[in-house]
A protein has these predicted regions:
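Active-site regions of metal-assisted phosphoester/phosphodiester hydrolases
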Residues: 1-75, 83-84, 99, 104-286
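Short, flexible, glycine-rich and Lys/Arg-enriched loop motifs at helix boundaries
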Residues: 88-89
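Active-site phosphate/pyrophosphate- and oxyanion-stabilizing loops and adjacent acidic/basic residues
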Residues: 95
Length: 286
């Protein structure tokens, strides 16, 4: 039965492959959303709760929404958020989460997943930022170095576009929702981190970088050296043991000019990644 289901899904995607229009990279990476739909009365003295989570396309939407509702975050950084893809119920996942959680949101596509959309609505998956506060200055940072994989020719996952980080400003803090390349080595991922650091504003403005880094080297990864040199601290380090809190972690939160401590929340039934929840407060003395 599973073979028949897999065959049927392959036929459906192949059909979509021939009818779905191809988007340009500019269209795929374009930022959209509702950045100022709501405004929560938040105190400036209250610590900020930030979540980063690769939601595996949002295919298990109800479970993802329930988990985020329990966490009650002020800012949410999402990776692999689908828009109008058959594999995730043709939802605009970030928009639907923002509505359900009563938050503002912006999203930028990473890849067009060819064959998962429709003739009138191509499927795009990418990074999103949700916030209880208005969102400003949102842009997609497309990495200069991409994997050498020929995604457009991959019969198992035909796609267009390239890896990006989504940057936005909300609540007086600059956020990056990051998804680094999985089909490459640590050297390429370190270069992608360098692209993010080149985009980080100069000065004392608080910055939080969170997401799926796809690293295999743990704290020894070359990308960490660049982040440390740029003044970023790793919120995922347990200061009591100085060891990463998650075993073999690939999801991280890094901060500059803001103090944060993060923990992993188990959510195996909602995604193939667990969400990371950080409590952050702005440094008063620089």
């Amino acid at each position: 039965m599973s073979i028949l289901i897999a065959f049927a899904l392959a036929v459906l995607r192949l059909t979509g492959f021939f009818i779905e229009p191809r988007l340009s990279d500019a269209d795929i990476h374009a930022v959209s959303g509702e950045p100022a739909r709501v405004m929560w009365p938040l105190s400036t003295e209250r610590p900020l709760t930030v979540v980063t989570w690769n939601i595996e396309r949002g295919a298990r939407f109800d479970r993802v929404a329930a988990m985020l509702g329990e966490v009650d975050a002020d800012v949410i950084l999402l990776q692999e958020a689908d828009r109008f893809c058959s594999r995730s119920g043709d939802r605009d996942v970030a928009r639907d989460l923002a509505i359900q959680l009563q938050m503002n949101y912006v999203i930028a596509g990473e890849f067009q997943e060819v064959g998962e959309g429709r003739r009138d609505q191509p499927c795009v998956s990418g990074q999103a930022i949700l916030s209880r506060m208005p969102i400003e200055d949102a842009i997609a940072v497309r990495f200069a170095d991409q994997a050498s994989l020929k995604w457009r020719l991959n019969p198992a996952q035909p796609r267009r576009g390239g890896r990006i980080a989504l940057r936005a400003r909300t609540g007086g803090t600059v956020f990056y929702s990051v998804h680094l390349e999985s089909g490459a080595d640590e050297t390429l991922r370190a270069k992608q981190v360098g692209d993010i650091l080149s985009d980080v504003p100069a000065g004392r403005e608080p910055v939080i970088i969170g997401g799926d880094f796809n690293n295999v080297g743990g704290p020894a990864s070359p990308m960490f050296a660049g982040l440390r040199a740029a003044g970023f601290g790793n919120a995922m380090i347990d200061t009591a043991s100085e060891r990463p809190m998650a075993r073999r972690p690939i999801d991280w939160i890094f901060t500059r000019h803001i103090i944060a401590r993060a923990e992993v929340i188990r959510a195996a039934d909602a995604s193939d990644h667990d969400p990371i929840v950080a409590t952050a407060s702005v440094q008063r003395r620089f």
